[in-house]
Every structure is written in C-alpha cells, then in structure tokens.
Amino acid sequence: MPTCPSCNAEVPAGIRWCGICHGNLIDRNIGRLASPGKRLGASILDWVIPFVALLLIMLVGGLFSGLGAAAGGEQAGGAIGLFLGFALLIAYIVWAFKLFARGTTPGKKLLGMRVVKEGGQPAGFGTMLVREWIGKVISGMVFSLGFLWILFDRDRQGWHDKLVSTYVVE
C-alpha cells in the first residue's frame, strides 16, 4: 500500500490527499487542505470586510454631509462624502478582483489560504467567479448542506468546490 510522503501514513491507491495530515500525495509543494475552522474564519472575514467598508462609507458620507450643512452647503458636503464612499467601494472591489485572479478571497488571503485546481495551479479569475458567486449560492440553497459537506468530505470540498474542481489549501 502506498504511503504519504509527508507523514508516512498508509493511503489507499488513487486518492489525492492524505486522510491523516491532509497533505497532497502527488505534489507536496501544493500544501495541505485547509481546516474547516480556518475556512469558516475566512468566510466570516469575507463578510465582515465589506460590512466595515460599508460602515465607513456611511460614516464618511454622514460626516461630509454634516460638515456641508454646518457650512451652509449641505449638497456639496453630501456629494463629497458620496464620492469618497464610492471610491472606497471601488477600491475594495478592485482589491477583491485582483485576489480572485490569484485564486483567493480577501479572507483567505488574510488567513494564508488559497484555492487551487486539481493540478495545484491557482484557480484563476473565471473559476473563482463561478465558485464564489454561483457555487456558493448552490451550497447555501438546501439548509447550507453544501457548506456543511466540508466537514464530512474526505477532500474537505464543499459543493462550490466540487462544481469547479477546486481545493482550499494552506
């Protein structure tokens, strides 16, 4: 029976990831499968970051609107606040899309994870768009079973991962 090159555990033939150390059996440089807890942390960050950005947009807009009203030009202050808030939103979107092109999300990047295809190459922009925007909708449709699937799947794949043949690695 073959053994894992990282932990020397016996592994069945034909599988890609070690069930003990979660290392890649074909190419050790790809990394290990990310834990479900770490993936949950990244998902939370992927929601918290835009929420904080939205709060900042509202704060900046309100601040400039208030300053404009105090100076007698309420519309000018509101317009400046709206412009700055919009600029912040665009900056976040550009940052997120650049990370998508590298096969990661803001939360995964901050926690040191990335999304790879079966051969270990980065998932890429198109794959990430389908995975994040279509696959995650599917994963969440039936009581979030597609996300919970990660806990029981040997390769720690959710339905959104299976849809585009991706793995989340550290």
Feature map (PLM): residue ranges:
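Membrane-interfacial and juxtamembrane segments of integral membrane proteins
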Residues: 2-170
